[in-house]
Amino acid sequence: MAVPARHTSKAKKNKRRTHYKLTAPSVQFDETTGDFSRSHRVSLKGYYKGRKIAKANEAK
């Protein structure tokens, strides 16, 4: 039966857990549309790097 050979100390456990964290998504202001969008992605209005790339899904 698989059993840990040694007890895992609090310090060792907590050092491992320091990397378990959330990171906020990078958001940039788009001057063309005046909206915020995530970097390296097409905005909701269909713009990427100031140019119209795709059709926007407009709500009716």
UniProtKB/Swiss-Prot annotation:
It holds the Pfam family Ribosomal_L32p. InterPro entries: Ribosomal_bL32 (IPR002677), Ribosomal_bL32_bact (IPR044957), Ribosomal_zn-bd (IPR011332). Residues 7-20 have a biased composition (Basic residues). GO terms for cellular component: large ribosomal subunit. GO terms for molecular function: structural constituent of ribosome. Keywords: Ribonucleoprotein, Ribosomal protein. Transmembrane segments: none annotated. Residues 1-21 are annotated as: Disordered. GO terms for biological process: translation. It comes from the Bacteria. PANTHER family: 50S RIBOSOMAL PROTEIN L32, LARGE RIBOSOMAL SUBUNIT PROTEIN BL32. Belongs to the bacterial ribosomal protein bL32 family. This is Large ribosomal subunit protein bL32. It comes from Streptococcus uberis (strain ATCC BAA-854 / 0140J).
